[in-house]
Amino acid sequence: MAHACARGVVAPAPSRVSPRVSGRRVVVARVGTSSAEASAKEAPKKSEAKGANEVQFEAVIGIETHVQINSNTKAFCRCAAVYGAEPNRHTCPVCLGHPGTYPILNAAVVKKAIALGIGLDCSVIRRKSTFDRKQYFYPDLPKGYQISQFDEPYGEHGKLDVVIPVEDGGGVRTIGITRAHIEEDAGKLTHFPAKGNEPGYALADYNRAGVALVEIVSEPDLRTGREVAAYGAELRRLVRYLDVSDGNLSEGSMRCDVNVSVRPVGREAFGTKVEVKNMNSFNAMSRAVDFEIERQTTLIRDGRGDEIVQETRTWDEGRQRTVSMRKKEGLADYRYFPEPDLPPLVFDNAYVDGVKAEMPELPAAIRARYAALGLPDDAVQVLVEDKALVEYFDATIAAGAPAKQAANWLTGDIMAYLKNAKDVTISTMPLRSKDLAEFCSMIENGEISGKIGKDILPDLLVGETGGAGPRAIVEERGLSQISDPAEIEAIVDKVLEENPGQLEQYRGGKDKLKGFFVGKVLAASGGRANPALSNQILMKKLAGE
């Protein structure tokens, strides 16, 4: 059954407020919240220095991540799923919940959701899962309920390997994934505070309402803000590799709600869970979580633990603190019941195998492959961050480049250039992978020095070589490395002859002058002298041999 999108149709939010519609703007009257009361409560100051026998606390952290699937249309209707359009342009009776309309599941959403479940190594990918209605009243939810999966999510019992920051012990830790389920997004509210005698209000944009999401719920396996940021970054990396989502935090296509509680070290029972929302970068996520851990720990140490309540708090970037938004609903408050207008989602093993066959190599496998090449951990992390960079590096290796040389130049000088270049990416820069392979091989084989490499690389990067490759440029400019011992010895003799005072000081015990002579030899050769050979000859000459 097809449903034509009705441009400009906006449904009243079935909530405690009544929106008034003006064109495509939906104006929602401001409702009373705990934000004013909460903002008046400053976070408690840190307790005095800990006593020797004071109880130590640890944080217990789990994350609910909402990932927008980058399908062309919404989850259950044909409205376009695009970011940044005119407010309420992409709405229709289906996504606004008008009576008599029926949702139809987007097949592209299912395929990408299953790919993500496989990527998360879910041991359970249900061949039959069901949809439910999650009911709550808020102006951003025009239907008064959200189609989700509750009793039977499509994916469960997964895991994600996360590179843990050195400050938290380093290494790779496996973070459990409780479940992954398909649901639809809510609309977006933009709040405007009161001014003078004018009351505050909110504008509702329902373009986002009905956009397809996968919600990924982690186990409470994280302990610090840095770990939370590392988990979020790894999950974003995965969804980008799979082309499930662009994972753009600032645009809301990936949103992380972090559940934080603290407990005495060694205790099994969890503390009171507080949800922290509205963090639009991983750095902000780390700071928000660390603040919330400190807030809860301080309250408990000061005998005010009963002030920690199950609630939703927002991160206030300007004040660098979490602020209470509202009491956190429980499962009973959502009144889940089976979605009557959607049949179960059913697929067979052949469908799952087909999705798996189309999946690319994932970050964890690439890390293992690069580690086997002997690449250092920091270079591996830089390379794996960008799928396009991985493809370029692999093409460079396939063209014959020594792996370590290629990784060094890519993650160093080339990435520095791309960071500062305007409208240039690894995929569009003029330096072809085969030319980088030739460049790296020439340095590895001693045909040119690293210094000469740095001199010619900028021309290769910006394409000012007339299409000539590295070897042709070196030959044209006479930059080949000097590896003839006799020629280098003559250069060294000339340098020593021109600097008798420094030579006398060196032989008198001023060893630091060695660098002076190395620089002079390098300059005299135009940067072409073989570094190892010239150093060997120089040391013999300095010793008077």
Swiss-Prot record:
Cell location: Mitochondrion; Plastid, Chloroplast
One annotated GO biological process: mitochondrial translation
Keywords: ATP-binding, Chloroplast, Ligase, Mitochondrion, Nucleotide-binding, Plastid, Protein biosynthesis
InterPro entries: Asn/Gln-tRNA_amidoTrfase_suB/E, Asn/Gln-tRNA_Trfase_suB/E_cat, Asn/Gln_amidotransferase, Asn/Gln_tRNA_amidoTrase-B-like, GatB, GatB_Yqey_C_2, Gln-tRNA_amidoTrfase_suB_CS, Gln_synth/guanido_kin_cat_dom
Molecular function terms from GO: ATP binding; glutaminyl-tRNA synthase (glutamine-hydrolyzing) activity
Pfam families in the record: GatB_N (PF02934), GatB_Yqey (PF02637)
Keyword set includes Mitochondrion: yes
GO cellular component terms, semicolon-separated: chloroplast; glutamyl-tRNA(Gln) amidotransferase complex; mitochondrion
Top EC category: ligase
Chief localisation class: mitochondrion
Record SMART domains: GatB_Yqey
Reaction(s) catalysed (UniProt annotation): L-glutamyl-tRNA(Gln) + L-glutamine + ATP + H2O = L-glutaminyl-tRNA(Gln) + L-glutamate + ADP + phosphate + H(+)
Enzyme Commission code: 6.3.5.-
Further facts: This protein may be expected to contain an N-terminal transit peptide but none has been predicted.
Similarity remark: Belongs to the GatB/GatE family. GatB subfamily.
Function, as annotated: Allows the formation of correctly charged Gln-tRNA(Gln) through the transamidation of misacylated Glu-tRNA(Gln) in chloroplasts and mitochondria. The reaction takes place in the presence of glutamine and ATP through an activated gamma-phospho-Glu-tRNA(Gln).
Assembly and oligomerization: Subunit of the heterotrimeric GatCAB amidotransferase (AdT) complex, composed of A, B and C subunits.
Protein name: Glutamyl-tRNA(Gln) amidotransferase subunit B-1, chloroplastic/mitochondrial
Gene that this sequence comes from: GATB-1
